[in-house]
Amino acid sequence: MENKKTCLHGKHVEAGALMQPFGGFDMPIQYTSIIDEHNAVRQHCGVFDVSHMGEITVTGNDAEKYVSHIFTNDIKDATVGKVYYGMMLYEDGGVVDDLLVYKMGENNFFLVINAANIDKDAKWINDNAKGYDVEITNRSDYYGQLAVQGPEAEDVMRGVLGQECSDLTFYTAKTVMIDGVETIISRTGYTGEDGFEIYSSHEYIRKAWDELMKSGRCKPCGLGCRDTLRFEAGLPLYGNELSDKITPVMAGLSMFCKLDKPEFIGKEAIAKQKAEGIKLKVAGIELHDKAVPRHGYTVTCNGKEIGKVTTGYQSISTQKSVCMALIDAECAKLGNQVEVQIRKKSYPGTIVKKAFYQKHYKK
């Protein structure tokens, strides 16, 4: 089956980007180099085409009640414009997807989901809506999305796109009319830096991209550095640090599962795991030597296999060899000594916190 293309696909090809399949789309992995693009976001500003992400709207009299039923975080007292991170769970606590939920109005919610999960999520959201007075619309084909990220992102939004965003704090959003098109701008991102995400029509997303490129103030970035950036910040990737087998408790994300809510799908399983403990846990590991721990590499403790690497890199920002790994929970205590098996050689490492880089968000 042919991969889908975003509304900016032609511009990426024209610019000579390295294109590869990701989440069912033909996406730019890098333009110049992953290191250059990573550093641009950490030091200045980078822009990503993230139009492959999915968008679903939930409206109707029971919209808030229904979103609360399928979402782990608590949206009960949400003001219009608030954005929440959380998960949708199966009854056993496995993760359907992790997502953002935007409250766009009274009983009007905007859900942003992972590209590879669009069809699965849309079906799951519809299947669980029986008995609720809601209208669920998959808008994934309508919206394009840009992520403008980095310490200079606010200046770029103002100076290049004419959008004043100083009123937005971290995890808030607003709707603006641009060229007669309703556009959502939020102060969110997946890089560990300050930044904004823009959801609009394909036509406006193409126009905004051209303006950003023309300005010279914003480097085009591919999904290669999006992964190195999110990894350094300790942010999970669905399929690696979260999955239908890796629960929020195992991933260290149970703070986004509000057990004081009356109910949500999977609540009982999460409460049970928190009370009884877990056998596996996602941990951070820093190697003592320069070697690159890759996804799937074996982690051992005193020669005994205890798990596998979920994501690993030589950190571009710190130059340290670090990884996240799903390992035996009893071995995951900070300071514990483990080994990662890389090309038939054992490299010693220490269990550390999963955030390998200090995040810079505007609170």
Model-identified regions with their sequence ranges:
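A subset of signal/propeptide-processing and intrinsically disordered low-complexity segments
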Residues: 44, 92-93, 222, 227
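Well-ordered mid-protein domain cores that form the structural environment of catalytic cofactors
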Residues: 74-107, 112-128
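Conserved, structured C-terminal
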Residues: 1-23, 27-29, 104-363
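Short amphipathic beta-strand starts and helix->beta connectors
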Residues: 34-43, 88-98, 130-132, 177-184, ...
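Acidic, proline/glycine-enriched N-terminal capping motif
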Residues: 1-86, 94-96
